[in-house]
């Protein structure tokens, strides 16, 4: 997916234009592989105050973000230095979730529910995915009213047939400046974590899911390994998604049975693993694809698997 950037106007000389035309086949070949830009991940719950308290107790105080334009949900945000963020979503009125694509998740206390990737050419990306044979729902406008009264607006497009951002990510394009939507939260300024690095996506059939992502984004074969607590993993180097398929039952199998294929864990980036481990009292250190991974106390996070990855 193309990186968001400011438009740049320029003039091309005839020679430059000719060179571009001559190299177009090579450029087209290279563009077949799409790099995703992770925008944000979502955690749903039945009560926003409860969600905020859970993450505050874990050492990352969320900022209240305001109600969404659908009149059904509201959110809080943990914004990181790299402009990615964790979104906490809950109904405005307790138990009233009709009209939200994540209604079934908001019946729970706290559960990972979606992931999104960003673009500044949403319609182009929708067209590309359709040509690749990926089902895409018509783009929709969305908005949120911040506590200061400012309206934040965007466009989204959902992929596949599940809930938004369940297996393939939903796509989001800002219609207002991005820094209206996310800024680094005071609760993580100067913290040893800098953003959301990976989404761990629970899947039933690893081979089928690998094929789906390769079809959508033109990626090469992933690296695979097995982790006792998750099952068999597949990682596409340089991309933000790790696929996880269970074996011999376990919590991941149970979760897939209840919610289907959705995110099951999120990993935050760090350049100082020791400092992150100390600050957040991480545990269960393992090595995933050559990187250290350790976890927040899942009990304190009411079952949410949130980890840190790095060196």
Question: Where are the model-predicted features located?
Answer:
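Bacterial N-terminal signal peptides
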Residues: 11-24
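Bacterial N-terminal signal peptides that target proteins for export
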Residues: 2-14
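Glyoxalase I/VOC metalloenzyme domain signal
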Residues: 27-38, 43-63, 80-311
């Amino acid at each position: 997916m193309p990186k968001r950037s400011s438009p740049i106007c320029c003039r091309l000389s005839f020679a430059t234009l000719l060179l571009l035309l001559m190299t177009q086949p090579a450029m087209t070949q290279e563009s077949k592989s799409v790099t995703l830009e992770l925008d944000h991940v979502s955690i749903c719950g039945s009560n926003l105050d409860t969600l905020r308290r859970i993450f505050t107790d874990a050492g990352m105080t969320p900022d209240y973000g305001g109600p969404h334009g659908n009149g059904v949900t509201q959110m809080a945000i943990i914004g990181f230095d790299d402009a990615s963020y964790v979104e906490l979503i809950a109904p405005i009125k307790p138990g009233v979730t009709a009209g939200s694509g994540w209604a079934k998740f908001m019946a729970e206390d706290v559960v990972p529910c979606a992931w999104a990737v960003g673009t500044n050419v949403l319609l182009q990306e929708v067209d590309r995915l359709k040509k690749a044979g990926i089902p895409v729902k018509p783009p929709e406008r969305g908005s949120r009213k911040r506590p200061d009264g400012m309206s934040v607006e965007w466009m989204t497009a959902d992929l596949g047939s599940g809930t938004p951002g369940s297996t393939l990510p939903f796509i989001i394009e800002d219609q207002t400046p991005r820094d209206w939507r996310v800024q680094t939260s005071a609760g993580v300024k100067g913290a040893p974590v800098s953003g959301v690095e990976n989404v761990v996506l629970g899947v039933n059939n690893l081979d089928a899911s690998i094929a789906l992502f390769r079809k959508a984004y033109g990626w090469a074969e992933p690296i695979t390994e097995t982790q006792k607590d998750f099952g068999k993993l597949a990682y596409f180097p340089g991309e933000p998604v790790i696929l996880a398929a269970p074996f011999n039952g376990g919590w991941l199998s149970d979760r897939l049975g209840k919610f289907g294929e959705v995110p099951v864990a999120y990993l935050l980036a760090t350049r100082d693993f020791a400092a992150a481990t100390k600050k957040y009292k991480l545990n269960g250190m393992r090595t995933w694809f050559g990187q250290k991974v350790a976890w927040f106390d899942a009990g304190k996070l009411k079952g949410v698997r949130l980890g840190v990855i790095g060196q």
